């Protein structure tokens, strides 16, 4: 579910509106609320949002819900988010931060690309990223040099080359172009996790 914090005009009434609107009663409520807000002002802007994707409000802020097609796009977005797992919601938050977003169309397009991204677990800093890369073999180092590695520099170089953004579970990055050792490690980790369930 996505709950929007809306404002009528610049200084008008503030309203909460939740999506997706799936039942006829919910759809009628959304339509009535929007008609009421639009009757006194041409704009109904999103001031914030509450959802499982923690940073979604940042990307929806300022969107004029009274504009053509915006209510439908928000409803479609909320529907897609409702079907995402908690892990996918965290991944999607990182995907939003890692991409250039300029409206609801971009956000909707990005929901279709979840499988193009991975989370590098526990990588919340350049230092932890470097340790992960060395540990999984993506950055091979002779055993006798392990104590001399500048993990932060390794992590920074990786981030510069691959982009991405942090999320609550690690670092979100596109799969395309990742070292095979990283992909293999993620695959092995996923299998181990599934066996433990």
Locations of the language-model features?
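Mixed-charge (acidic/basic) macromolecular-recognition segments
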Residues: 29-141, 145, 176, 185, ...
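N-terminal ordered "arm"
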Residues: 1-44
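Acidic, low-complexity, intrinsically disordered interaction modules
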Residues: 142-156
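Long, highly charged low-complexity segments enriched in Glu/Asp and Lys/Arg with interspersed Ser/Thr
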Residues: 156-190
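Short amphipathic beta-strand/extended segments with alternating polar/hydrophobic composition
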Residues: 16-20, 58, 183-185
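Non-Sec secretion/translocation targeting segments of pathogen effectors
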Residues: 150, 190-197
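Conserved aromatic
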Residues: 20-24, 120, 148
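Short, surface-exposed beta-strand/loop "edge" segments at domain boundaries and coil↔beta transitions
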Residues: 11-16, 53, 178-182
